[in-house]
Amino acid sequence: MTSSSSFSRFDGRAQDQMRAVKITRGFTSNPAGSVLVEFGNTRVMCTASVELGVPRFKRDSGEGWLTAEYAMLPAATAERNRRESMAGKVKGRTHEISRLIGRSLRAAVDLSQLGENTIAIDCDVLQADGGTRTASITGAYVALADAIKVLQERGVVPGSPLLAPVAAVSVGLVDGNVCLDLPYEEDSRADVDLNVVMTEHGEFVEIQGTGEETTFTRAQLNDMLDHAEKGCRELVAAQKAALGI
């Protein structure tokens, strides 16, 4: 672990320590799956809704589809942000995160076992304090699992399309020190910022990483990935505990 004896984190955690994680199922009653996920002060509502039919490019394929949308409530941050729908344009960051969530969750489901049905994932950030996209992915997996259970109970899906759990966490270099699960105060001044998505089996789904006006070495990258792997293992354990498996 890269560490400086004089370095201390904003909230007093160890460098490889997650914030408190809480996953609450059944947060709302209308969707097939609904979860409130909390990474410290970051709180995201993740829902999974079932829609009959698939997009045109999937029609007559016999396969299902999973899509995702991400948004932040205006008061999710300290300074209110105008709703993007009212501004008439969805920001590039929002599109990027929506696509990331969709890709990550498609790695957790066998689309060939869904039939021609669509699962729509919606992640709405209620309160943002860093790690909103990683919290969204982690919570959305649990909502997805509940939605698939509903499909099975209805007899729509005879098999088990759900694959190994997928979770995500942020990791970065803060003042040259590798830190896991960055809150906003650390994320906003990190030298390097990574978002890592992994399966229960330790396989990578996606790695997003950038140097913020700096560079990083292969050794530092390996150190960050080791931290991320530890965090994802803990998150998968939290997902399974929430699902009672």
UniProtKB/Swiss-Prot annotation:
One of its GO terms (molecular function) is tRNA nucleotidyltransferase activity. GO terms for biological process: rRNA catabolic process; rRNA processing; tRNA processing. Phosphate binds at R93, G131, T132, R133. InterPro entries: ExoRNase_PH_dom1 (IPR001247), ExoRNase_PH_dom2 (IPR015847), ExoRNase_PH_dom2_sf (IPR036345), PNPase/RNase_PH_dom_sf (IPR027408), Ribosomal_Su5_D2-typ_SF (IPR020568), RNase_PH (IPR050080), RNase_PH_bac-type (IPR002381), RNase_PH_CS (IPR018336). Keywords: Nucleotidyltransferase, RNA-binding, rRNA processing, Transferase, tRNA processing, tRNA-binding. It catalyses: tRNA(n+1) + phosphate = tRNA(n) + a ribonucleoside 5'-diphosphate. Its EC number is 2.7.7.56. HAMAP family: RNase_PH. Belongs to the RNase PH family. Phosphorolytic 3'-5' exoribonuclease that plays an important role in tRNA 3'-end maturation. Removes nucleotide residues following the 3'-CCA terminus of tRNAs; can also add nucleotides to the ends of RNA molecules by using nucleoside diphosphates as substrates, but this may not be physiologically important. Probably plays a role in initiation of 16S rRNA degradation (leading to ribosome degradation) during starvation. Homohexameric ring arranged as a trimer of dimers. This is Ribonuclease PH. The gene is rph.
